[in-house]
Amino acid sequence: MQSKARQSKARLSNALWLSNAHTSAFISFTVAKLNPRDHHPIFTTAASMQPCPAVPISNGLKIPVLGLGTSHNGGYSHEAVVYALQECGIRHIDTAKRYGCEEALAGSLLESRVPREDLWITTKLWPGDYGYQSATQACRASAARLGVEYLDLYLMHWPDCTVPGRSNREVRAETWRALEEMYDEGLCRAIGVSNFLVSHLEELKEDCGVVPHVNQVEFHPFQQPWELVEYCRREGIAFEGYCPLAKGQALTHPVILELSKKYNRSASQICIRWSIQNGVITIPKSTKPHRILENCQVFGFMLSEEDMDSIGRLHTDTKLVRLSYPLWKG
């Protein structure tokens, strides 16, 4: 069980220290107080006219706190993405080479007619492409498949790698240096990691020059890695959470259902709102237009501190997403 003090501290510390080799700034961002009158919108949902705030990251860019996730195994729908962009005002799309839908996504972006400069596009580097040269080639190939001249955010998908005779740390550092160069070049507006633990981030800090702008990790009522969240905030690393509905498992939990009834909101809206109120950039996935619209309508209400804590007590350290490679903590 997570301590109530730690959860409260994390919510109260939703102010991000923004720092890099040249600048240091403190930007207040109290997500728990966000509502439709806030002045941090990056897009407005067309159907409900609710503004979506943007989270500042350490290089000064801003990421919409709500995105649309994609995936493999039926986790992509051309029609749903176009609907999300045109009708729901979604501007943050998350994908990965591993999902196999970058080229299809390019078609959806084109059909939506949303200007490129209004979009935030994230994709990820698969461990099979780790290494300096292969990472560089893979990044350029992803941009080409997506039909864009630059990526807003490029992430190392997992801390593991599969290079015989070399340590994970060595390969991660070499790969990260390739990302740093693409960041300096402007091919990537921001670079980051996914599924990295504190130990991986500490090693990367020691071995490289640019601290990751983002760490994207599994985050939902049953998986609340507060130590990692707090570390990222101290180090100026924006924290993104995927799988906010726990692959649907959270939607039938009695606590979530009770809050759904109390707030007259769907169970998915309760989970997404809880995640956002914790200061987490939240990326739900859906291929159903009505679910996407529902997931966007989370800025017109707030959960009380008591109800936030009720969900906080659901932590069981349950991970629903794992990499098939061995030595994931290596």
Predicted regions and their residues:
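Acidic (Asp/Glu)-rich catalytic clusters
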Residues: 106-116, 143-147, 205-208, 229-234
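Active-site mouth loops of central-metabolism enzymes
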Residues: 66-75, 125-131, 165-168
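N-terminal binding-site loop/beta-alpha segment at the start of enzyme catalytic domains
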Residues: 34-37, 42-119, 174, 246, ...
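CE4/NodB-like, metal-dependent polysaccharide N-deacetylase domain
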Residues: 135-156, 181-185, 237
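Beta/alpha (TIM)-barrel catalytic core signal, keyed to glycine-rich beta->alpha loops juxtaposed to Asp/Glu
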Residues: 127, 158-330
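Low-complexity, intrinsically disordered or signal/transmembrane-proximal segments
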Residues: 2, 7, 22, 39-40
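Short, acidic/polar
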Residues: 74-85, 131-145
